[in-house]
Structure formats: structure tokens, C-alpha cells
A protein has these predicted regions:
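Short, well-ordered amphipathic alpha-helices
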Residues: 28, 99-106
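An acidic- and aromatic-residue-enriched active-site/binding cleft used to recognize and process polar
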Residues: 46-49, 93-95, 120-124
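Gly/Ala-rich beta-loop-alpha elbow adjacent to hydrolase catalytic centers
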Residues: 90-100
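Active-site catalytic motif of lipid deacylating hydrolases and related acyltransferases
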Residues: 2-86, 219-260
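Extracytoplasmic/secreted cell-surface and envelope-processing proteins
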Residues: 10-12, 53, 98-100, 127-131, ...
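Surface cap/lid and interfacial helix-loop subdomains adjacent to catalytic sites
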Residues: 70-84, 105-255, 259-260
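Structural recognition of the beta-strand scaffold that forms the well-ordered cores
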Residues: 1-2, 40-45, 89-90, 117-120, ...
């Protein structure tokens, strides 16, 4: 029990203890919100690589196999002990998306038939990977099944972090052409939403670069250390589109169940 002369200190101490005991509590609450409370989710611990890893190829070669092995083992456990032959959605962001692609490349036919969709967010999927892996099927709309959703958001093409992705879709209007879509949302997850003015942004897919061009974004606190770049919105790929992603997961799941 923590006592204090002021409620503010008690709250601050409670938050500090919560962060130390449950370091990923905020992230898991965010995932729970993304799933609308209508789906269960399985999010195992794994030995995640630091941002420093991606500054040198030799670091990636040495460290990523450890993370990949952890997630593969966790997915096998999920299928054997938890899933019970039910439909499922795969979702990963950045490093998690890279590893998720490894799961797709090894997935057997029976498991794939139960996969509603895969969301590989904030990663590039090369053409040769798509050609090699029949389980990676590019999403073409809002409700297709067994597909992979992928996108990367930037101010313009010069801000890209990765090479062109062969799989890309606009998560606001769920189109793969250049049709623009209006996105209105709070610009940053670092402040309470009630304290923010919403940005009105225009999002369109640039077919030549395979990137989402975002006009009208006001935040300045998005640049990642070590690997980030001004005008690249990698750290906000889920935050900006969270409402669209939530609705889309629910739609794809409903369509999948309707077709069974």
C-alpha cells in the first residue's frame, strides 16, 4: 500500500509500479482496443531485437533468428493448445510483421484455410517473396479472405525506409489504385485524445513507389531513433489507421464466418 500527502504522487507511483511489473500493459491495452473487444488475442513474449540491430546487416543476421525462433515456437503452441481449429487473424507491426511473413511462408494448407487475413504493417514485401510463398496473397479490397494487408506511410517517396513493397493497399478506403481518401484523427498517441485537435489528412496510394502518401499530418514526435527519417510515419502506422483497422478486422472476420 502506497500512501502520500497528495493524490497526484500516489497516481504517479502507481503508474511507475505498473510499468515495472507489467511493462507491456499499455501496448496490450492498445491491442485489445484495436480488436473492439469482440475477439480474443494471443500476444506472446519474444526476444525482440533492438532498433540498433537494424543499423548493421551483421547485427540482423545474428539477432533476428532468435526472435524468429521464439515467435515460431509460440505460434506452434498457439495452434496446438489454444486455437482449437478456429479461424484466426495474423497481425504484426515492423519487426513483428517481418517475423509474421516467416510464419506465412511455412504455413500448411489446413492452417491457411482458417486464416481470415494477415496484417503485415510497416514492412516491405518483395516481389520474390510473394512469388515464392503462395500463402502471401495481396489484399484487393475490404472483405477478401486469406489475404495479406500491407502499407507504409510517408510524406513523399524520398522519405521511404524500405524498398518498394509488392503488396500494398490504402487502409482508409481499401483500394489499390490512386483514389484519395480523407482521414480525420488525432495526430499522436503520446497525448490524451481529448487534449488534441484532430488532423484532417488526405491519403492516397502512389502506385509507382508502393507507398501511402499522407498530406496534412501535423505531428513532429514520430521520428524513430537510429533508423527513423523525417517524413516517414513508420511509428504511427497503427495509430493513424486504428479505427479503419478495427472495422476491417471485424468485417473480414464476419465475411469469413458467413462463408463457412
Amino acid at each position: 500500500v502506497i500512501t502520500s500527502e497528495t493524490g497526484t504522487r500516489t497516481i504517479m507511483l502507481t503508474r511507475m509500479l505498473t510499468v515495472r511489473v507489467f511493462p507491456f500493459l499499455g501496448e496490450m491495452q492498445g491491442v485489445d482496443g484495436l480488436l473492439s473487444g469482440d475477439m480474443n488475442f494471443y500476444s506472446p513474449y519474444y526476444r525482440q531485437c533492438s532498433l540498433e540491430t537494424f543499423t548493421k546487416d551483421r547485427y540482423v543476421a545474428k539477432r533476428m533468428p532468435v526472435a524468429v525462433r521464439d515467435v515460431k515456437n509460440a505460434f506452434r503452441f498457439y495452434l496446438a493448445k489454444i486455437n482449437r481449429d478456429r479461424p484466426f487473424i495474423l497481425a504484426g507491426f515492423s519487426q513483428g510483421a517481418m517475423i509474421m511473413l516467416e510464419l506465412l511462408q511455412e504455413m500448411d494448407v489446413d492452417t491457411y484455410r482458417r486464416m481470415v487475413a494477415a496484417y503485415a504493417i510497416g514492412v516491405s514485401i518483395p516481389e520474390e517473396t510473394v512469388t515464392r510463398c503462395p500463402r502471401i496473397v495481396a489484399a484487393q479490397g475490404a472483405a477478401d479472405q486469406g489475404v495479406t494487408v500491407c502499407y507504409n506511410s510517408v510524406r513523399d517517396a524520398s522519405c521511404a525506409l524500405w524498398d518498394k513493397s509488392a503488396v500494398v493497399i490504402n487502409p482508409v478506403n481499401w483500394r489499390t489504385d490512386t483514389t484519395s481518401a480523407l482521414l480525420v484523427t488525432e495526430p499522436t498517441p503520446r497525448l490524451p485524445v481529448k487534449e488534441q485537435q484532430k488532423d484532417t489528412m488526405v491519403v492516397h496510394l502512389d502506385v509507382e513507389s508502393g507507398l501511402l502518401f499522407v498530406d496534412g499530418y501535423s505531428a513532429t514526435d514520430y521520428v524513430l531513433p537510429l533508423i527513423g527519417r523525417e517524413g516517414n510515419y513508420h511509428s504511427r502506422e497503427i495509430w493513424l489507421y486504428r479505427d479503419a483497422l478495427r472495422e476491417n478486422m471485424a468485417l473480414r472476420a464476419a465475411e469469413f464466418l458467413r462463408g463457412r
